[in-house]
Amino acid sequence: MFSCIKGKERTFRNLINGEWINSSSDKFIDIYSPVGNCLVGKVPAMTTDEVDLAIKSAKEAQKVWRDVPVNKRAEILYKAADILIEKVEDIAEIMMREIGKDKKSAESEILRSADYIKFTADTAKNLSGE
């Protein structure tokens, strides 16, 4: 699960401009679980230039996204919600380790998030008359 972000030894990468990358800093930030203080994973410590690039890329992506018709946006959001539902157990497992949530609470939060994404997509379609 999540092989696109996870490398060996629970070392994660950042998604910038559609690509999974490591930081040129070659430094990592260790993430520990509040339960048992065990290592959950490591995330790249990004350089200032990499943070600036991530922000610039997000702004450019927003320009493209705003031109996507509402129906297409809703379709994409529904797909994202469906993926959350499909992967609820895997995501809950990560949440349990990373932030110490119990399984029931983690799964409930994921399912509520999926519902809210769908609600938001439906609201946007109704507001635009599509």
Each predicted region: which residue ranges?
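Terminal low-complexity tails and localization/encapsulation signals of metabolic enzymes
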Residues: M1-K42, E75, L127-E130
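Glycine-rich loop-to-alpha-helix module at the N-terminal edge of alpha/beta enzyme cores
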Residues: C38-L127
